[in-house]
């Protein structure tokens, strides 16, 4: 199948934002203007095309990132809609992994919000070029210039306006395009009657000031333009666009534009910006991975290269079963062909290939380099797996997902539904890597764990709707961790003699605190422990670390060196050394000043001035640590770190304290030591 558009005309981009910044509405408008939708879907009435799960339509928030294909000015756009709610950071993470660029949507009255920061950091991690769209310019309290300064202050991003608004709040009429030096004014609510005019006299001075600042910023990123600028020569529109594109792709500049998606003002200009300034698959570095020998390998975005693709999302479709959303980095994937899942070392048959438009689909014979689509019929592929050619295998870097911070016990309302619930939970866990489920061996209860209360609410809701399993849910439990504070040396000998073959294992370890992942170092010399038993000691330590000695929580941030030990010619076995390893770990931990850690949430609360004292007092009583305050549009924004255990039911408490006028958002930030009194309380509760 011949390409409809060449690779340099592809734009794979995501729309990322804080909840309620108007991300889904913006995507809907893009689909409207690119000619796919005839009637615009509104999130307000639950009819939005992108929000295709029932729960999303009811709650008005986007949960599943749907990949949608559309066309604009001879370019193919693949849009990934990402959720802005903190409990769904995993969706954002996995979509950023496969994007080439992104549009960050800000709410004109709030600027940068907590989730904007989280998403921005994730985009930094993957080096995703971004442009900034300041939405809701028609809302009361809208302030474009304040928004831009929040990007500079809080995100430390070089935000450069390439438009400035004409009017704001109910008088928002359009914008001045600083590159072309014209005013764009809207005369209707569908964005159809849009006229280019001379810049109004009262804006001439401001436009001149911001245009000069923009030209200087673009020139700073390009040596040739800098020379022209310093010589006082005129820089042409084409040169400005080319310079801005180069600087945006290099992450040196974040171009800023404005609009109101709901009022259909500025969306077409934003799509033009995506085409003009965000990268094509040819503008980004070759994708890196390793071959089967573990050596570094890379693939360029070209149809002639061997196939390499990443399955970035698994979804269950009511009609066709399992869909694997996939980004093709190089080569061509054809329906009916066989490929290698190099992550799992298994051969897979590509069933049907479809391009997704929100939740309708168009079947295609092949997906080429740079394209995004969904594969039907894969048996063994899960999120983060690489699909590649069998002749030239490559394993692309997989994705990292955060561990859950909250868990609840769950049971079906009828005994008969137990098996059905187990199968449903397994299916949901396959779709969402931050959702985990297991059985508590002591109580026999099924436990589900995720990134927040809303995350688990939606899982329970999906069990009921999609799998027809109604459940009773226990009280939420915090995922505490344990760690150590000092370096120690400890040993353990496991010896059993009872006629016949005995058991013997002896290990001496040094254990110390460390930042980051668990490290095991083998420092045995002179064969004190035979090589084949070393991994058993490591396994014993890792298994024992799943149940710390304070309250049975997972132990993190420690390093172990196996320094000495002894063995018995006849009685030693892997099992004996595994037990010795786990005993040595417990002995070491009891001496190493163990402490309990709890998840700390970054909380941002917006309240009217008159409730501030009461709300701050309440945050302090929840063991919160104030980080700062800021007055925004007549309200106070309070920032603090608060332990997750103190935040359950906070929404209700805040509502009653502020007569329903306070709002808050929170996102997991880090783990911190628990005060002694709380540690004793948690350990006591666990022992009951």
Swiss-Prot record:
Pfam families: EF-G_D2, EFG_C, EFG_III, EFG_IV, GTP_EFTU. Residues 8-282 form the tr-type G domain. Signal peptide: none annotated. GO terms for cellular component: cytoplasm. It is found in: Cytoplasm. The keyword Nucleotide-binding applies. Keywords: Cytoplasm, Elongation factor, GTP-binding, Nucleotide-binding, Protein biosynthesis. Belongs to the TRAFAC class translation factor GTPase superfamily. Classic translation factor GTPase family. EF-G/EF-2 subfamily. Catalyzes the GTP-dependent ribosomal translocation step during translation elongation. During this step, the ribosome changes from the pre-translocational (PRE) to the post-translocational (POST) state as the newly formed A-site-bound peptidyl-tRNA and P-site-bound deacylated tRNA move to the P and E sites, respectively. Catalyzes the coordinated movement of the two tRNA molecules, the mRNA and conformational changes in the ribosome. PANTHER family: RIBOSOME-RELEASING FACTOR 2, MITOCHONDRIAL, TRANSLATION ELONGATION FACTOR G-RELATED. This is Elongation factor G. It comes from Clostridium botulinum (strain Alaska E43 / Type E3). The lineage of its organism: Bacteria, Bacillati, Bacillota, Clostridia, Eubacteriales.
């Amino acid at each position: 199948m011949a390409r409809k558009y060449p690779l340099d005309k592809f734009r794979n981009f995501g729309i990322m934002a804080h909840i309620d910044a108007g991300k889904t509405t913006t995507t809907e408008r893009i689909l409207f203007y690119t000619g796919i939708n005839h009637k615009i879907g509104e999130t307000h009435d639950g009819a939005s095309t992108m929000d295709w799960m029932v729960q999303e339509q009811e709650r008005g928030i986007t949960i599943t990132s749907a990949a949608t294909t559309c066309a604009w000015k001879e370019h193919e756009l693949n849009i990934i809609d990402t959720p802005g709610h903190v409990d769904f950071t995993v969706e954002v993470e996995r979509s950023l992994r496969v994007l080439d660029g992104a549009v960050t949507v800000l709410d004109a009255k709030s600027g940068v919000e907590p989730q904007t920061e989280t998403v921005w950091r994730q985009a930094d991690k993957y080096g995703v070029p971004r442009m900034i769209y300041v939405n809701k310019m028609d809302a009361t309290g809208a302030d474009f210039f304040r928004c831009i300064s929040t990007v500079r202050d809080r995100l430390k991003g070089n935000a450069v306006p390439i438009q400035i608004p004409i009017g704001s709040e109910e008088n928002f009429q359009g914008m001045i395009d600083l590159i072309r030096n014209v005013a764009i004014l809207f005369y209707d609510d569908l964005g159809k009657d849009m006229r280019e005019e001379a810049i109004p006299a009262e804006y001439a001075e401001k436009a001149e000031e911001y245009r000069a600042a923009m030209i200087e910023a673009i020139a700073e990123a390009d040596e040739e333009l800098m020379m022209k600028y310093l010589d006082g020569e005129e820089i042409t529109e084409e040169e400005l666009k080319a310079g801005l594109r180069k600087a945006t792709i290099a992450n040196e500049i974040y171009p800023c534009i404005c609009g109101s998606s709901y009022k259909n003002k500025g969306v077409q200009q934003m799509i033009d910006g995506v085409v003009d300034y965000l990268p094509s698959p040819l503008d980004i570095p070759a994708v890196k991975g390793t071959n089967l020998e573990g050596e570094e390998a890379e693939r360029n975005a070209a149809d002639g290269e061997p196939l390499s693709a990443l399955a970035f999302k698994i979804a269950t479709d009511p009609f066709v079963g399992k869909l694997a959303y996939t980004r093709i980095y190089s080569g061509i994937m054809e329906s009916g062909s066989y490929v290698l899942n190099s992550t799992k070392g298994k051969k897979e048959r590509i069933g049907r290939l479809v391009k997704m438009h929100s939740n309708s689909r168009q079947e295609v014979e092949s997906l080429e380099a740079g394209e995004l689509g969904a594969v039907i019929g894969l048996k063994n592929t899960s999120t983060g797996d690489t699909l590649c050619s069998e002749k030239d295998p490559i394993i692309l870097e997989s994705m990292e997902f955060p561990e859950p911070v909250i868990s609840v016990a769950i049971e079906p309302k009828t005994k008969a539904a137990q098996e059905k619930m187990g199968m449903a939970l397994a299916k949901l866990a396959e779709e969402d890597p931050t959702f985990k489920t297991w059985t508590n061996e002591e109580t026999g209860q099924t436990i589900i764990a995720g990134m927040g209360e809303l995350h688990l609410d939606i899982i329970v809701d999906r069990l009921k709707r999609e799998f027809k399993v109604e459940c009773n849910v226990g009280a939420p439990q915090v995922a505490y961790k344990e760690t150590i504070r000092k370096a120690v040396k400890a040993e353990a000998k496991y010896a059993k003699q009872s006629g016949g073959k005995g058991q013997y294992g002896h290990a001496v370890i040094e254990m110390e605190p460390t930042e980051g992942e668990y490290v095991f170092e083998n420092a045995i010399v002179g064969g004190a422990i035979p090589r084949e038993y070393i991994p058993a000691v490591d396994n014993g330590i890792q298994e024992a670390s799943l149940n710390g000695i304070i309250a049975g929580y997972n132990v993190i941030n420690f390093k172990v060196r196996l320094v000495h030990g002894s063995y018995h010619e006849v009685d030693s076995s892997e099992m004996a050394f595994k037990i010795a390893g786990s005993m040595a770990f417990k002995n070491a931990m009891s001496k190493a000043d163990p402490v309990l850690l709890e998840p700390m949430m970054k909380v941002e609360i917006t309240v009217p001035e008159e409730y501030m004292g009461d709300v701050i007092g309440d945050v302090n009583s929840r063991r919160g640590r104030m980080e700062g305050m800021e007055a925004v549009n007549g309200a106070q924004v309070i920032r603090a770190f608060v332990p997750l255990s103190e935040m359950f039911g906070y929404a209700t408490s805040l509502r009653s304290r502020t007569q329903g006028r306070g709002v808050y958002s929170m996102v997991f930030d880090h783990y911190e030591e628990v005060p002694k009194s709380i540690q004793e309380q948690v350990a006591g509760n666990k022992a009951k």
